[in-house]
Amino acid sequence: VTAIEMDTELVPILREVVAGRDVSIVEGDAQQVDWGVVLASHPAWKLVANLPYNVATPLILDLLRDVPAITEMLVMVQFEVAERLAATAPDPAIGIPSVLVAYHGRAEVVGRVPPTVFHPKPRVDSALVRIVRHEHPPVDTSLDRLEPLVRAAYNQRRKMIRKSLSGLRTVEQIEAAGVDPQARPETLDLAAWGRLADA
């Protein structure tokens, strides 16, 4: 077990608690550590984390993109964030994180955590999300081709994709991908995004 903790006051306490066990404590910020070095001792890892809500989504997406050694995650995040991470079309909660997570793995909300289990009590509910990495992406396109389209469309999510993607794909290209140019992004599944990426 390797634990990453950025609270400098907590690190010595953790080291004392786990002394004599097969646990190493790395002092640092999970957004800045060199994951290649931290995880060098084994080829595959499972990540379990109670993530600060303000960094949860970018950190999860960074780990999915950059740290293939992490094959599975169980993370606690704000409930609404959990819904977005696991959403699939045509769920109204779907957004940029939903599509990017689906490219890398399968996500599901596996438990809801009420504020009463924390002290002090937060104002929001939390949830546990499990993400299992795909051995290969389910669409035959690169993230570099797919992500700009997803971001462009969801940054103008109320617009039809023929408008939001107008600088990236022509109406003819959208139609050739088998996608309705008048569709809005939340109606498109990952397969449709894959076809658009390769159009």
Question: Would you name each region that the model predicts?
Answer:
Residues 37, 166, 175, 194, ...:
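SAM-dependent transferase fold signal centered on methyltransferase-like domains
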Residues 47, 185-188:
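Phosphate-binding beta-loop-alpha motif at adenosine-nucleotide cofactor sites
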Residues 124-127, 131-133, 138-172, 180, ...:
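An accessory alpha-helical subdomain
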